[in-house]
């Protein structure tokens, strides 16, 4: 069913959930895995960059480290992942990379936001559901590493 799964990852708890659920789905379907980390270029980051030269470069360096850890974890699970770290607006970058790699499933984490925060920052999920040309899984099932590896073991991994 799914042959090319894109995992959106930012190192957060929600990103970890997306990584776990996406890896389980990819394993179940025998899919190729793609990983994307987006350094969000938000107004806050631009303000930080204006007052602290190098703030964006530091944020990118942090994300590169998170990306490498996630890639290593996926390799340990038997995947041969491909991916990259980009800077920009997460929803736009995820949709663009999904088209680029011809993904048939995109997995993102769910981060709860208040009404004001949703209005101010926009809706990544809504943008993706409108702009993706493939299925979208919004990972919400927070499982521990033990449960995750147990599910992989019972799946024949």
What are these regions (language model features)?
Residues 134-145:
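Short, flexible loop segments at boundaries between secondary-structure elements
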Residues 34, 82, 137:
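Conserved beta-strand positions in the Rossmann-like core of class I SAM-dependent methyltransferases
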Residues 72-106, 143-157:
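Structural beta-alpha unit
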Residues 31-32, 79, 103, 134:
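Short glycine/serine/threonine/alanine-rich loop segments
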Residues 1-53, 131, 156-157:
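Small/aliphatic-rich secondary-structure junction motif
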Residues 108-131, 145-149:
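Glycine-rich, Arg-bearing micro-motifs that act as flexible, cationic patches
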Residues 37-38, 109-111, 140-141:
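Short secondary-structure boundary segments
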Residues 52-65:
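A short acidic, glycine-rich active-site loop
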């Amino acid at each position: 069913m799914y042959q090319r799964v894109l995992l959106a990852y930012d190192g957060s708890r929600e990103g970890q959930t997306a990584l776990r659920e996406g890896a389980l789905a990819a394993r179940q379907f025998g899919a190729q895995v793609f990983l994307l980390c987006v350094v969000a270029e938000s107004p806050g980051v631009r303000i930080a960059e204006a007052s602290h030269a190098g703030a964006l470069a530091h944020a990118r360096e942090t994300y590169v480290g998170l990306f490498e850890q996630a890639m290593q974890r996926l390799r340990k699970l038997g995947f041969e992942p491909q991916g990259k770290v980009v800077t920009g607006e997460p929803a736009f970058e995820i949709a663009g990379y999904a088209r680029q790699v011809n993904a048939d499933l995109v997995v993102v984490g769910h981060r709860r936001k208040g009404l004001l925060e949703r209005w101010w920052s926009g809706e990544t999920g809504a943008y993706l559901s409108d702009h993706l040309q493939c299925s979208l899984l919004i990972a919400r099932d927070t499982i521990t590493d033990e449960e995750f590896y147990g599910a992989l073991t019972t799946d024949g991994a």
